[in-house]
Amino acid sequence: MGGATILNGSNVTATGSKTAEKVFGENAKKDSPQKLAEDVSNESLHTNDENLTQMMTENIGDAIDFISEFADLNYGKAQTQTPEHSIDRQIELPSSSSYELVKKLAEAFTKKGGQIFLDARVEHILQDKEGKVTGVVAEGRKRTLTVHENAIILSTGGYGANLDMRGKESQGLNYYGPQTSTGDAFQFLAPLELQTKNIGWYKVYPHGVEVEPGIAKLTTYASKKATDMGAIYVNKEGHRIVDESNVYAKLRNAVLEQTDKMAFLLMDQRTWEEFYHLLVLHDFTEEEIQHYFANDGKKSPIFVHGSLKEVAQKAGIDAEQLQKTLNSYEKFAAQGKDEEFDRDPQFLHNYEGDEFYVVEQKDRFATTLGGFVTGADLNLRTKNGERVSNIWGAGEVIGGANGHDSMPSMMNTWSISSGYVAANNALLQLK
């Protein structure tokens, strides 16, 4: 239960909500659904479905206020306000984990009389003589479950774990999403001949380490903190690759261009200590980090420390060029002017001491951006353009709202707002 959402840090936008007024005060009035929609369009290079984007941005405020009251969620200002957003609007839960979100929502739902069936994988749909969907059949390890319903909200997630559905764009990228994201709905809804769009689009992020072949863990909080403290990204050739304080899309694209699609974060002792603290806070254990260092750079994930020459040799970086790169960066930091990438001077900091840490950084994805086609009403559409009157979609299974590249916090924004709208539309039809 929880899908890809349960793996993230609970970040979401609060545009138009009472929650935003509480968290951001007067500054919340400077934001608007239109401003958020413009940011979405700009980030996705206008590949987004404007109708879905508008629906998302106009409803996220009410949706956040509803779930906050329904499940007693105490949202606060997110630790990181990412530069992709033109204004501070990102909030998160105290635990910085969507596990808290899913757990509390599930508890509140069952207290209201709702039922949650685990170990129940939908295998096929039930239809009447006219072809209308009347329910589903799910299989578990010990039972078959048949559910008859007049209204169905489809929130089965994406297809990132299904290698047969993955396209060229995902090649060479590590996956950190749930292994349950197998695109089941695209199989069991096949009899309806539904429209799909953008299958093969993925939300690709930087800040990953490959903990198993093809499987990643994210280091976003730690990596962002490190670059705020002045850390730099280098490639195997020992060169800097990007303005480390730029938006995530710039960093992501720069990493994809490097040898083996990999970069390295170079840190001093003071930066590593902050980096380490945030790793342990967000999904890593002290034991596994020690294990990574014990590998001494011989296999992924690469975590090494020592002198500059030692970390270069262990990580497979050109040591001579790395020294030249560091010397140049130190000069830029001292003069307050980055002559190579024009990095914001507030993030230019000299390295301290002679102990260095290097951690690999690879791009990764958990969520897919393509899916079924709907209108702003979120009813699924057939290939003939007909509206499926009693099935609504919500979350990752629907493609289009964020286009080809979503901003940070926008996948949660889409899942929460679309779920809210789909549920309201279903209730209206049932009345």
Positions of predicted regions on the chain:
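Conserved N-terminal/central alpha/beta ligand/cofactor-binding core
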Residues: I6-Q115, A231-Y233, E237, R270
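Helical element adjacent to the flavin cofactor pocket in flavoenzyme catalytic cores
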Residues: L93-N150, F186, A190-L192, F372
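C-terminal structured subdomain/cap of oxidoreductase catalytic cores
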Residues: T146, F275-H282, G370-K431
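A glycine-rich dinucleotide-binding beta-alpha-beta segment and adjacent secondary-structure elements
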Residues: H124-L126, K132, Q321-D405
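Redox-cofactor binding/interface segments in oxidoreductases and associated redox assembly factors
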Residues: A14, L154-S155, G393
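Short, small/polar residue-rich loop motifs at catalytic or cofactor-binding pockets
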Residues: A226-D228, A366-T368, P408
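An anion/pyrophosphate-binding glycine-rich loop and adjacent beta-alpha core
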Residues: F186-A190, Q195-K314
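Glycine-rich loop(s) and the adjacent beta-strand/alpha-helix scaffold that form part
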Residues: K142-R143, V147-E212, S409-N412, V421, ...
